[in-house]
């Protein structure tokens, strides 16, 4: 059985309350780990009550999370992990460059991802993983003018004032209950931050899987991942991979209308075996009924 879950409902319908109930049950009745991506800071009191770690991430905090951290076992069945990691990095540059990310840029990014990771993989994942700072340096070494466009566009997020994901991770993420609070991350960093933290969570899932430990992942406001193609592909891949690594993933959102405009989001909804629908707006209710083939009676 696919244990992944989607919870939908308008603001105030009880989504957060139902998730908190489930988290409490998991913590009190199992030895599993629970990881929460919390864009609104809604889970902070509960995390504190259960002795969990609250990692507060903002442009002004001292917390650093390396966007390019990668655990052994990142890809399926011993396959080359770089195609998947390259897609993740492309999703980051998609946030940075928006509609200006062209085919030439994508080729350069893929080439440079291969270059900075090969030594790390060849070493058996020993030592420090590369960082976005290393990647930017590799991009600058490329001869194409498009490479310089990439390096300049990414400067704010790599060597500028919003560089919190461009350096080595400096925070302990090993508490059984860990929440990533990104309430104060700011508009510019929020989409990129959600991607990086979700990637960090995925690396933790891999660690736990290799240690024989189950992980529950709760992602609030996950509809944001369906705004951009590469981010969508990354989220869908993680949605599939987490359950293969003894994890359960829950997506939570009130933006049902936004999800229903995405073909991939509709596919997720139509193929989820565990779907919780709380109070919906009239238009969303009708659209969900049509998508899921729910009759009026």
Residue ranges and their predicted role:
Residues 1-59:
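Glycine-rich phosphate-binding loop of nucleotide-binding enzymes
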Residues 34, 216, 250:
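Hydrophobic "anchor" residues on beta-strands that sit immediately upstream
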Residues 51-55, 263-278:
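A short helix-turn-beta junction within AAA+ P-loop NTPase domains corresponding to the substrate/partner-engaging
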Residues 71, 291-296:
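Conserved AAA+ ATPase "sensor/coupling" helix adjacent to the nucleotide-binding pocket
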Residues 253-254:
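H-loop/switch region of ABC-family ATPase nucleotide-binding domains
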Residues 282-292:
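Conserved beta-strand-loop-alpha-helix hinge in the C-terminal portion
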């Amino acid at each position: 059985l696919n244990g992944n879950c989607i919870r939908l409902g308008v603001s105030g319908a009880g989504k957060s309350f139902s998730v908190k109930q489930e988290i409490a049950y998991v913590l009190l009745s199992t030895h599993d780990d629970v990881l929460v991506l919390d864009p609104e800071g809604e889970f902070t009191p509960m995390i504190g009550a259960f002795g969990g770690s609250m990692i507060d991430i903002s442009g002004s905090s001292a917390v650093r999370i390396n966007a390019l951290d990668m655990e052994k076992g990142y890809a399926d069945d011993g396959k080359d992990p770089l195609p998947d990691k390259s897609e993740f990095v492309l999703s980051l540059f998609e946030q940075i460059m928006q509609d200006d990310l062209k085919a030439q840029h994508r080729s350069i990014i893929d080439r440079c991802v291969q270059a900075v990771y090969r030594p790390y993989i060849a070493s058996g994942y020993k030592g420090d993983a590369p960082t976005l700072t290393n990647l930017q340096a590799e991009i600058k070494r490329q001869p194409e003018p498009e490479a310089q466009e990439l390096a300049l566009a990414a400067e704010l997020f790599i060597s500028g004032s919003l560089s919190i994901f461009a350096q080595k991770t400096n925070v302990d993420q090993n508490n059984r209950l860990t929440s990533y609070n990104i309430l104060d991350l700011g508009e510019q960093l929020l989409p990129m931050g959600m991607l990086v933290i979700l990637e960090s969570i995925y690396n933790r899932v891999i660690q736990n899987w290799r240690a024989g430990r189950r992980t529950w992942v709760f992602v609030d406001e996950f509809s944001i991942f369906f705004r951009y193609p590469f981010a969508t592909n990354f989220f869908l891949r993680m949605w599939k991979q987490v359950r293969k690594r003894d994890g359960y993933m829950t997506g939570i959102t009130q933006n049902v209308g936004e999800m229903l405009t995405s073909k991939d989001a509709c596919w997720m909804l139509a193929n989820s075996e565990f779907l919780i629908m709380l109070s919906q707006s009239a238009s969303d209710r009708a659209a969900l009924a049509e998508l899921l083939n729910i009759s009026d009676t």
